[in-house]
């Protein structure tokens, strides 16, 4: 009997355990997390999602299936490729711009950023950058909670070159980070390495011959039964990259500074009909028409300083008018600072902390404000080959938006919000970086009552000494 009772008790215990293990036998206890809302943003009337013990779709899955809306309202919208719109709305749906205009109707559930009295621009693009993302495969190697990424967002940067990939500054997530893998085909065409130059030309000529034979075969295969395609087994590695260049599937990139190097690059691009981006080009102003006719694109720093060669009988050296002269010749420009990283030292505008200030210095050299803005937005996107997705505020493009408290090229302007893929990635009021600077948003531009060189109020003993030596005590 004792053994029988023990067996019955053991069987009853197994039955109870099996009943508890059945799905739907008890309500889910996992808490539902709601996205945090910024104090300076509001969310239009949203209906909370509820769960019941019998449902098979979790709250997280339902949230992923639901459309995600964000609207920037009441701002002065600079579309860059179109007109400036006063008191307009930019509405995004699932990270893509869905509508722009003064009379956009918002959906019931929509996160709203009120930009009344503020300026709205497309996200800035750093065509040359380091230290924001990982050098290779940014989704796996980037610190999405790092200070460098946050500081870059505070400067309005939403897209940057990461190694050879183009990536978004998706703070806190790696979702939809990579815009374009393998942005460039790197070329070495230095005047100091004649053997490499000769080899590159020979390789390009071989690929061009192959493409011509392939075109001939495509024309003749319908009428000639004995037509044979050219051998393509060798089209791999560097030759596959060159094939993409000559078929305009890829963009080349190289460093070139002097007049002679720039002439050689322009000749190479014209001869083999491919698009090339030159980095540096501080003497580009001396051959600007040649670069423009060859379709060369350039990544430059307007304040790059190089003294002219006194022994040369032609124009040499750098000039602050470089950007202006290149742009007038039809060269597509991307402006970057001299130090294309995030640093916490140096003068304003010398690194990616103030990409906009480097563009402002190009205005000092004669570039128009509109073209300077293009050089850090849509034209920078064209240099990277991603202008179909970023660089301007247009319906169908990624919702990368910067909201700031003044003209983007003004040295006192601060970014209020940076939006990446339709999500607020930076909010000035919520981060400690600049929250203490003009927290109420009021800005008074200082008025200087002196002229350069400034006349200072020197102590009496200094002015007396200056007078003794014939100086001016003013």
Question: Which residues does each PLM region occupy?
Answer:
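C-terminal cap of metal-dependent C-N hydrolases
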Residues: 75, 394-438
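Histidine/acidic residue-rich metal-binding segments in metalloenzymes
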Residues: 206, 212-277, 282-298, 317-330, ...
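Histidine-rich, glycine-flanked metal-binding segment
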Residues: 68, 77, 81-121
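His/Asp/Glu-enriched, well-ordered alpha-helical/loop segment
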Residues: 135, 251, 292, 301-304, ...
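N-terminal signal peptide c-region/cleavage motif recognized by signal peptidases
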Residues: 14-16
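Divalent-metal coordination cores built from histidine and acidic residues
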Residues: 114-230, 330, 461-466
């Amino acid at each position: 009997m004792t053994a029988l009772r023990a067996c019955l008790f053991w069987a009853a215990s197994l039955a109870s355990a099996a009943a508890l293990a059945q799905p739907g036998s008890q309500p889910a206890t996992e808490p539902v997390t709601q996205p945090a809302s910024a104090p300076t943003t509001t969310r239009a009337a949203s209906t909370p999602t509820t769960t019941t013990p019998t449902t098979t779709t979790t709250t997280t899955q339902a949230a992923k299936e639901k459309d995600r809306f964000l609207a920037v309202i009441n701002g002065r919208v600079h579309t860059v490729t179109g007109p400036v719109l006063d008191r307009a709305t930019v509405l995004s749906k699932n990270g893509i711009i869905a509508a722009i205009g003064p009379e956009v109707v918002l959906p019931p559930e929509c996160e709203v950023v009120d930009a009344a009295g503020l300026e709205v621009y497309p996200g800035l693009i750093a065509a040359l950058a380091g230290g924001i993302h990982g050098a290779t495969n940014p989704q796996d190697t980037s610190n999405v909670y790092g200070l460098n990424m946050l500081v870059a967002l505070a400067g309005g940067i939403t897209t940057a070159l990461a190694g050879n990939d183009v990536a978004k500054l998706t703070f806190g997530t790696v979702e939809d980070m990579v815009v374009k893998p393998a942005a460039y085909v790197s070329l070495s065409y230095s005047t100091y390495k004649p053997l490499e130059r000769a080899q590159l030309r020979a390789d390009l000529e071989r690929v061009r011959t192959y493409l011509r034979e392939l075109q001939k075969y495509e024309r003749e295969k319908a009428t000639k039964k004995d037509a044979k395609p050219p051998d393509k087994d060798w089209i791999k590695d560097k030759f596959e990259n060159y094939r993409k260049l000559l078929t305009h599937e890829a963009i080349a990139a190289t460093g070139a500074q002097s007049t002679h190097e720039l002439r050689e690059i322009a000749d190479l691009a014209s001869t083999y009909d491919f698009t090339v981006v030159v980095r540096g080009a501080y003497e580009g102003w001396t051959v600007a028409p040649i670069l423009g006719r060859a379709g060369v694109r350039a990544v430059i720093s307007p304040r790059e300083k190089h003294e002219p060669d006194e022994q040369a009988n032609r124009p040499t050296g750098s000039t602050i008018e470089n950007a202006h002269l290149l742009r007038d010749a039809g060269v597509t420009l991307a402006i970057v600072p001299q130090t294309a990283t995030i640093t916490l030292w140096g003068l304003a505008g010398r690194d990616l902390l103030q990409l906009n200030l480097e563009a402002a210095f190009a205005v000092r050299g004669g570039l128009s404000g509109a073209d300077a803005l293009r050089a850090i937005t849509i034209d920078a996107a064209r240099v990277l080959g991603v202008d179909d997705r970023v660089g301007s505020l247009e319906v169908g493009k990624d919702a990368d938006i910067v909201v700031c408290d003044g003209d983007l090229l003004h040295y006192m302007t601060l970014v209020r919000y940076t939006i990446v893929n339709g999500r607020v990635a930076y909010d000035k009021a919520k981060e400690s970086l600049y929250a203490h600077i003009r927290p109420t948003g009021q800005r008074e531009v200082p008025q200087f009552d002196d002229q350069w060189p400034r006349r200072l109020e020197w102590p009496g003993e200094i002015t007396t000494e200056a007078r003794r030596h014939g100086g001016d005590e003013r």
